[in-house]
C-alpha cells in the first residue's frame, strides 16, 4: 500500500472513531510499523487534519 492510500485510510479511521485510536492499533491494522504511523500522522497534521 502506498503512503497516500495509507494516510487516507488513517484519516478515515481517525475521523470515524469516537475515541482516540492508538498508533499501535493503526500500525497493526495497516500492517506497518508504529513509526510509519507517527510519520504519516505528522504529515496529515502538517496538511491540516
State what each model feature region is.
Residues 41-42:
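Short, hydrophobic-biased segments on the C-terminal half of alpha helices
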Residues 1-29:
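Extreme N-terminal segment that seeds HTH/winged-HTH DNA-binding domains in transcriptional regulators
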Residues 35:
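Key DNA-contact positions within bacterial/archaeal DNA-binding proteins
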Residues 48-49:
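Short, Lys/Arg-enriched C-terminal cap helix and immediately downstream tail that follows
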